Swiss-Prot record:
InterPro entries, per the entry: Asp_de-COase-like_dom_sf (IPR009010), Asp_decarbox (IPR003190)
Subunit note: Heterooctamer of four alpha and four beta subunits.
Leader sequence segment: none
Protein name: Aspartate 1-decarboxylase
Matching Pfam families: Asp_decarbox (PF02261)
Bound cofactor: record note: Binds 1 pyruvoyl group covalently per subunit.
Compartments where located: Cytoplasm
Amino acid sequence: MDRKMLKSKIHRATVTGADLHYEGSITIDLDLMEAADIIPYEAVCIWDVTNGSRFETYAIEGERGSGVICINGAAARLVAPQDLVIIASFVNMENAEAIAHEPKLVFVDDKNRMLESRKEVAGQATLKSVHWKN
């Protein structure tokens, strides 16, 4: 049996741009792509923490060290600069491999510089926690 598993995640990156007239994709700083083991043209899911939108596109490499996270094409209508997003990629693997699998999780600061790569802790609070207003 195959399972679809989280392969990698860039957690709470800040959107630096939204280019409606580019042909599609998400431009990601090459340093972050390498840290998260995401390659050019790999499918990625984008989850906008700020507004709740979710969509799938593909990654293209941005300038190394630039901190760029730019949503391109039609999906640019789903985000705004300064939104916080989670960028995730998935992989299918056999059950035995999936049991031992550990995804690459990359945590960034507000300038999209990598802070650390570590395991995710269930229920963990972050310094950037959103406080819901009624």
